[in-house]
Amino acid sequence: RLEDGEEFDIDDVIEAFVDIKTGVSPSEKLYWRRNKIQRDVACVFLLDVSASTAESIEDSSSSNDWDVPDDPVDYMKWVKSRRKSGIVRTYKRIIDVEKEASVLIIDALENLGDQYGIYCFSGYGRENVEFYTIKDLDEKFNDSISGRIDRVAPLHATRMGPAIRHTITKLADHEARSRFIFLITDGRPQDRGYSRQGVEKEYAVYDTRQALIEARQQGITPFCLTVDKSGHDYLKTMMDDFSYEVLSDISMLPARLPELYKNLTT
């Protein structure tokens, strides 16, 4: 109960009215006020922009689990086959839904006042790890960021481990009480040369797992959201005891992302 505040507390007003009618001196504390909870959060969103994100959300396979060829010529053929990029598109791609989700989460975080960065990643062999900035952690939102979102396009393969480690270095410079890495992907980690002979898929998964453990050791909480319907097969290993969610309907990503962020950070 407050003597001054934003709005009347209807229960207190009724009680005061009853007191007056019965000859009792009413309380002057008739108001209430919303107390804003001080948040100290920094979060990086990592978007997978591998070639598979060029797929239509209607025609995407139940699993984005492919064998990435190590031969350079075969690798480029593989990348081109995954992109399927035509001049005119009449369908929505996975990457288009990722962009929509980015716009919505930006709107939510601008209202919350949390520190946040949005980056996208891919890979083209060990010497060509791709990491691009959509919005840096220290950057104020501006029209240039909207332009960067528009220009995001499917690239190569899914080299997660190095992208996560680079993100750790970015968050290490921020002294927020709560720090998070939010990984958004459509498939398992894989890339040309992202392997040891005979254990290609396992090596990529375990390297990513180790990168996530390194994040936790720095006080950073990782979370993975995937639209790969068979994601449980490898995420149980890759995420260890970290949280993840497999989204069965890709079109729900823009609505689900802010909900998960709220649950994760409160």
Q: Where do the model's predicted regions map?
A:
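Negatively charged sequence features
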Residues: 1-68, 74-76, 80-81, 115, ...
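VWA/integrin I-like adhesion module and closely mimicked acidic/polar interface patches used
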Residues: 151-157, 168, 187-236, 247
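Short secondary-structure boundary/capping segments
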Residues: 59-64, 132-138, 195-202, 238-243
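C-terminal helix of von Willebrand factor
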Residues: 242-266
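Von Willebrand factor
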Residues: 129, 133-179, 189, 226-229, ...
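Intrinsically disordered, low-complexity acidic Ser/Thr-rich regulatory segments
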Residues: 76-101
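An active-site-proximal "capping" alpha-helix that borders the catalytic cofactor pocket
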Residues: 96-113, 118
